[in-house]
Amino acid sequence: MTSGSKKRKFSFIDLFSGAGGFSLGFTQAGFEDRLAIEIDDSAAQTYKLNFPNSEVWKRDICSIHSLEILEEASDEIDVVLASPPCEPFTAANPRRKKTPFERFYEDPQGALIFHVSRIVGDLSPKFFVIENVVPLADSDGREIIKEEFRRIGYNKIHFNFISCEKYGCPSYRNRLFISNVHLDVVPQKKKKVEEVLLDLPSPSYPNNIPNHFRIPFPKQVKNEGIGIRKGHADVYFKGSSRENRNWTKLNEKELAPTIMGKSRFIHPLENRPLSVREQARLMSFP
């Protein structure tokens, strides 16, 4: 490469892209997105809105051949990102199957991770990162993953367990990042709820902030949340191994609880549910 030539950016594809949180982090780090794959129509449309210049396929990953990806990318793929569904593995799911073997091989959603390994094996990227919940690697789950990646030529993989609140996320969030590289992340100052919510105007009044509008309480929340103390919840429900809380009133001086698929929160200073934008900020979306 000559001094006057343009340096090539590292490229990535995003499997199970959702609205694009994983892609956002990598593009902010200077990587170039080549393709996003997402089966959910609303999520795929949101991704396209967030990344208007990106190619988005609203398709089932099970039906996609790796050659199609290579043809679309028209160049080497450096990184494969993947966030397959966590429902088969999370302890918050009361219908989670009993053993890791059943979760990977009998649950159709759990088996999707093998389509990730199929594509990784075909594309041979410089590195891959698979994000999911920590229980995916419970007991035999870790050995199932190791054996699958040994089969496609990756003899050593790393199970990177990261507590995201130590790296700037304003809510407790323990995540697993499976990769062929060890992720060495520099800790950041913890952020409290007030640092990410209280600069927003009340959604009761007109504003031009995306997804920041007032949401009514559902009928199951008693007295529209009146009387709930900070840090306490109005609704409790059973997961596969523990009791979970919902409609928790946040404490602005603390971190938010772990956000799950159906988690909803009450504003710490106003008696109302959080807006969609406020909820996103608790997960460190801008």
Language model regions located:
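Core alpha/beta nucleotide-donor-binding catalytic domains of modification enzymes
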Residues: 2-124, 134-138
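Short catalytic/ligand-binding loop motif for oxyanion handling, primarily in non-cytosolic enzymes
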Residues: 23, 87-92, 136-139, 168-171, ...
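Short gly/ser/thr-rich secondary-structure transition/capping motifs
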Residues: 60, 159-162, 238-243
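Short clusters of hydrophobic/aromatic residues that line enzyme substrate/ligand-binding pockets
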Residues: 64, 89, 169, 197, ...
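Extracellular/periplasmic catalytic domains that process cell-envelope and extracellular macromolecules
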Residues: 73, 170-172, 250-253
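Conserved Class I SAM-dependent methyltransferase catalytic core
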Residues: 108-171, 177-180
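Flexible, glycine-/basic-rich loop-and-beta segments that form/coincide
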Residues: 168-222
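C-terminal target-recognition/interaction regions appended to catalytic cores
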Residues: 212-286
